[in-house]
Amino acid sequence: MSVSVETRDLSISFGTEPNAVKVLPGVSFSVQPGECFGLVGESGSGKSTVLRCVSMLTDFWKGEVLIAGKSVRDMPLIDRCRILQMVFQDPYGSLHPRQSVRTVLNEPLVIHKLGDREERMRKAITDVGLPVSFLDRFPHQLSGGQRQRVAIARALILEPSLLLLDEPTSALDVSVQAEILNLLQRLREERGFTYIMVTHDLAVVDHMCDRFAVMLRGEITEILPRQAIAGNGATHDYARELIGASLEYEGAH
């Protein structure tokens, strides 16, 4: 089932007053059920921080985050983990090096007291395009792309409605990036997931997202449809510059 997401005046500071640094001064956006919504901008613009706030990995923010109209702060942890999952940037750092794929996938099933564990693990691993035999492999026996597929399988195994994707392909080779993006696209079409995707790459946005927000110094400068990329339909100076630079790069390659 798809869910909507809404942030209202989401703000967060790091450090103590009077030297606290405001990383997000007040971010507001909404995501429709089944939509893929992108967050783009330069490094340090607050994109990943937004995901950490939405997921409650960072919990000392102010404002509101609503999923299907319910505040994430009011959701019990066990319920929140069933609704949303996150896929991280580094497939080499997101899996425990001494745990087999079977252990990685079984752990959330044990925590949530779900039955049919073997069947669920087999389905999760084959859904991401890996054979069942990979359940008995360890991370060092997998390529970067295979590790990221396992990370996606771990996110899928609790059957969430919302996936938070923090640059899920940036650490991978170009050919593998395309495979992972196509996998994510297929899964969204088949299951109706809602995605919020952080990326530096506007080509990824063009391939994956319905709309995207351009962030600068913790603020959203503009929210645009995917179609605005090809003709650089942005109105904010920074957004136009960012899209223009991406188009020039793509044209040169």
Which role does the model predict for each range below?
Residues 138-142, 146:
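Conserved ABC ATPase signature
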Residues 17-18, 71-85, 99, 111, ...:
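ABC ATPase NBD coupling module
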Residues 55:
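Helix-to-loop junction immediately C-terminal to a conserved catalytic motif
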Residues 118-133, 244:
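Conserved ABC ATPase "signature" region
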Residues 63-73:
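Conserved ABC transporter NBD signature motif
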Residues 40-42:
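The feature captures the beta-strand-to-loop junction immediately N-terminal to the Walker
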